[in-house]
């Protein structure tokens, strides 16, 4: 990786319960607040890998190599924006250093379909809807659905969470 970021991990082992996934978000929120952050200073973004899997079915994308390349491209949307991601979903992209990254070689119409579907911001999977219901039961509201939260690694298979600070970090 060419960028630096801080992260920590917490996992439940031995359960596939969506209750556990929802509780992780609540736990993250509680930890951040104990560290002195106010709810207004961060947001937990959620998505589901199943959304992209359904999308790949919709455009008849069967090649595992193309899927992985497309996921890695979509994972860069926060850094490259849609223009850069479109290039990576297509033939490829040359970055500022001059390095060329081969793209997923998707057709222009498939790239447009992906962009349109992900910009709808409508939770379409059962798992995500269940997590949203659990959040409501917990009166937990410090989250937003963001379909651009996608991980380019194969072991991500379901709900995905990411915490973003709403202020610039100095030092």
Model regions: which residues?
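Extended, charged alpha-beta segments that form solvent-exposed binding/catalytic grooves
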Residues: 1-143, 147-155, 162-170
């Amino acid at each position: 990786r060419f960028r630096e970021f801080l992260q920590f991990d917490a996992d439940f082992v031995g359960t596939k319960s969506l209750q556990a996934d929802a509780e992780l978000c609540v736990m993250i929120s509680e930890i951040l607040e104990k560290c002195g952050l106010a709810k207004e200073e961060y947001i937990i973004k959620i998505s589901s890998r199943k959304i992209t899997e359904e999308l790949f079915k919709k455009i008849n994308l069967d090649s595992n190599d193309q899927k992985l390349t497309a996921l890695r491209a979509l994972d860069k949307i926060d850094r490259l924006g849609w223009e850069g991601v479109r290039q990576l979903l297509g033939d490829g992209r040359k970055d500022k250093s001059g390095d060329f990254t081969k793209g997923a070689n998707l057709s222009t119409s498939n790239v447009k379909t992906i962009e349109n579907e992900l910009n709808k911001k409508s939770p379409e999977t059962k798992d995500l809807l269940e997590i949203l219901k659990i959040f409501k039961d917990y009166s937990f509201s410090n989250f937003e659905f963001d379909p651009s939260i996608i991980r380019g690694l194969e072991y991500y298979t379901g709900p995905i969470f990411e915490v973003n600070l709403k202020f610039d970090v100095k030092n």
